[in-house]
A protein has these predicted regions:
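A short hydrophobic beta-strand segment most commonly corresponding to one strand
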Residues: 96-99, 124-126, 140-158
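Short, conserved beta-strand element in jelly-roll/cupin
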Residues: 79, 90-106
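Short beta-strand His + acidic residue motifs that chelate non-heme Fe in jelly-roll/DSBH
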Residues: 86-89, 106-108, 127-140
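Conserved SAM-binding loop
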Residues: 117-121, 128-130, 135, 146-150
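Non-heme Fe(II)/2-oxoglutarate
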Residues: 1-69
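Fe(II)/2-oxoglutarate
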Residues: 160-169
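A short glycine-rich, His/Asp/Glu-containing loop-to-beta-strand
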Residues: 62-82
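A short beta-strand-loop-beta hairpin characteristic of the jelly-roll/cupin
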Residues: 99-120
Length: 169
């Protein structure tokens, strides 16, 4: 990756997606001050198998988005209240981000000290989440995003070597 947060070729209708999702209740996250709601569920391995839309989110707009993205993992609406941010962290899988509402909100790469604005601009962005980062809302309204995990791939070791470690006497 050149950057932590890059625009993809995928154009979306963020207004239509926001309208489609607006009538759903979000739950308070037990780990932080954010509100979140999964829009799909896992029927297999959390990190490796494609997730399916929950019936209440299985609409033509969401089906179209999922077709554009291909098989994906967990997808959730995340609301970051004004004046709040996430703890610094890194994740194991990359994620797509679609901003549905934002006002002076940023994803911040803490390794390079770069800030990326989260704009409601009808584009899907790809984020390299293995970098130490945070999301911060410096604005006066909630930052709402649809965040979608990319699936991990199974890797096959080429020419593995076995070693045995024994304690010294």
């Amino acid at each position: 990756y050149l950057y932590m947060f890059e625009r993809t070729h995928i154009k979306v209708n963020s207004e239509a997606i926001a309208r489609d999702l607006q009538h759903h209740t979000l739950q308070q996250d037990s780990w932080d001050s954010m509100h979140k709601q999964d829009i799909n569920h896992c029927e297999g391995n959390f990190f490796y198998d494609a997730w399916q839309l929950k019936p209440e989110f299985d609409t033509p707009i969401m089906q179209d988005l999922m077709l554009k993205l291909g098989p994906v993992g967990q997808a959730k609406i995340i609301v970051v209240p004004p004046g709040t941010c996430y703890q610094a962290h890194a994740d194991v899988e990359d994620r797509y981000h679609i901003t549905l509402q934002a006002d002076h909100s940023y994803l911040i790469d803490l390794e390079s000290d770069e800030m990326y604005p989260t704009l409601k601009d009808d584009w899907c962005y790809l984020m390299n989440t293995q970098r130490l980062h945070t999301a911060a809302n410096f604005g006066y309204q909630d930052r709402c995003q649809l965040v979608i995990r990319r699936l991990l791939t199974h890797h096959q070791l080429m020419d593995p070597h076995h070693i045995h470690i024994k304690p010294m006497q």
